[in-house]
């Protein structure tokens, strides 16, 4: 009998835990790293994550520890599932503990503030490993649905197709269907920008602007993503796939989406601080909208929806005023 694949998941939020379940259901031995002892104890003693996936029974071949060295030991895959703006600091602490040939897997959908780096670039910069040992899992993957073992598809992206195929095999279950892709740039941009567009659609929903507005924001948001991706060397087909349109539609349509919910609260008139106070988990788009806009400006790409979201979230611009400015921009051909 072959030895089971070993996976370490650093982060016990809803998505890290849900993906750990996927790996376990696919036959891997999974260890979750938890920052808090009480959460690790709950996972091990009750087979649940009461903080982030209450009521979901976790597989027997998934356990938790607060010791990062124990989690990382001999792991074939080291999955990173922490808030994107904390990745650099956390990973710097974990790098000395990592197994020599482990594949680093990013579940994060963001762009780092200041550097405007994608998450795989941060991993490469901090861990000093080549792109052939860094993979990304992305797509329309709402954690609560996956934890309920509802059908979902995803993209496993890596510059090395063989590594992508290894990870694909390690997380393929009857309910979770991963596809491989070597376009890491496009896959990561799709995930990062959709969080920003999810905020925009949520704001529109909170304002009661209707489905025409939602459809327009989704479509033009996809156009913004594609423009940025093309300038950065991404494959345009990526944006019509799971990492682009698929993820965007799920985020902009579901009440389970943290970014959509965050935007909805802003659109209903809550202040930024009030919205943060009622948001239990990280809505990545709140911080990443600034870094996505920074990235776009570095590449000379016009992203008006992203700019509008930054104005509302970080500059205190009233949504009604921001909407008026967005709608009164000069007319242009659609395919620009």
UniProtKB/Swiss-Prot annotation:
Natural source organism: Streptomyces avermitilis (strain ATCC 31267 / DSM 46492 / JCM 5070 / NBRC 14893 / NCIMB 12804 / NRRL 8165 / MA-4680)
Job description of the protein: Catalyzes the reduction of the glycolytic intermediate dihydroxyacetone phosphate (DHAP) to sn-glycerol 3-phosphate (G3P), the key precursor for phospholipid synthesis.
GO-annotated cellular components: cytosol
HAMAP family referenced in this protein's UniProt entry, alphabetically: NAD_Glyc3P_dehydrog (MF_00394)
Pfam families linked: NAD_Gly3P_dh_C, NAD_Gly3P_dh_N
Alphabetical list of InterPro entries matching this protein: 6-PGluconate_DH-like_C_sf, 6PGD_dom2, G3P_DH_NAD-dep, G3P_DH_NAD-dep_C, G3P_DH_NAD-dep_N, NAD(P)-bd_dom_sf
Pathway connected to this protein: Membrane lipid metabolism; glycerophospholipid metabolism
Record localization: Cytoplasm
Residue sites binding NADPH per the record: 14-15, 35-36, 109, 143, 258, 284
Catalysed reaction, written as an equation: sn-glycerol 3-phosphate + NAD(+) = dihydroxyacetone phosphate + NADH + H(+); sn-glycerol 3-phosphate + NADP(+) = dihydroxyacetone phosphate + NADPH + H(+)
Protein name: Glycerol-3-phosphate dehydrogenase [NAD(P)+]
A GO molecular-function annotation: glycerol-3-phosphate dehydrogenase [NAD(P)+] activity
Xref: SUPFAM superfamilies: 6-phosphogluconate dehydrogenase C-terminal domain-like, NAD(P)-binding Rossmann-fold domains
Residues the entry annotates as binding sn-glycerol 3-phosphate: 109, 139, 194, 247, 257-259
Broad enzyme group: oxidoreductase
BP term (GO), one: glycerophospholipid metabolic process
Alphabetic keyword roster: Cytoplasm, Lipid biosynthesis, Lipid metabolism, NAD, NADP, Nucleotide-binding, Oxidoreductase, Phospholipid biosynthesis, Phospholipid metabolism
């Amino acid at each position: 009998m072959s030895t089971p694949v070993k996976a370490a998941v650093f982060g016990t939020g809803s998505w890290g835990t849900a993906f750990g379940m996927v790996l376990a259901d696919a036959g891997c031995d999974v260890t979750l790293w938890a920052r808090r002892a009480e959460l690790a104890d709950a996972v091990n003693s009750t087979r649940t994550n009461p903080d982030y996936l209450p009521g979901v029974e976790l597989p027997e071949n998934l356990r938790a520890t607060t010791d990062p060295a124990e989690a990382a030991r001999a792991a074939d895959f080291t999955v990173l599932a922490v808030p994107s703006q904390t990745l650099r600091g956390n990973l710097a602490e974990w790098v000395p503990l990592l197994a020599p040939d482990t594949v680093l897997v990013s579940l994060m959908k963001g762009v780092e503030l200041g550097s405007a780096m994608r998450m795989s670039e941060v991993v490469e910069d901090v861990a000093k490993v080549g792109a052939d040992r860094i993979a990304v899992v992305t797509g329309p993957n709402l954690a609560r649905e996956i934890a309920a073992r509802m059908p979902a598809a995803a993209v496993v992206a890596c510059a090395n197709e063989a590594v992508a195929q290894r990870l694909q095999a390690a997380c393929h279950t009857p309910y979770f269907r991963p596809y491989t892709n070597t376009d890491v740039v496009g896959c990561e941009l799709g995930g990062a920008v959709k969080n920003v567009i999810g905020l925009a659609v949520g704001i529109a929903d909170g304002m009661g602007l209707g489905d025409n507005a939602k459809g327009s924001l989704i479509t033009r948001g996809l156009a913004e993503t594609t423009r940025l991706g093309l300038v950065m060397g991404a494959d345009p087909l990526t944006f019509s796939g799971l990492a682009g349109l698929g993820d965007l539609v799920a985020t902009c349509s579901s009440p389970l989406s943290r970014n959509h919910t965050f935007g909805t609260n802003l659109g209903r008139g809550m202040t930024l601080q009030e919205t943060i106070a009622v948001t239990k988990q990280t809505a990545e788009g709140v911080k990443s909208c600034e870094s996505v806009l920074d990235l776009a400006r570095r590449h000379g790409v016009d992203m008006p929806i992203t700019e509008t979201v930054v104005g509302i979230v970080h500059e205190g611009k009233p949504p009604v005023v921001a909407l008026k400015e967005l709608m009164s921009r000069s007319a242009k051909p659609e395919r620009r």
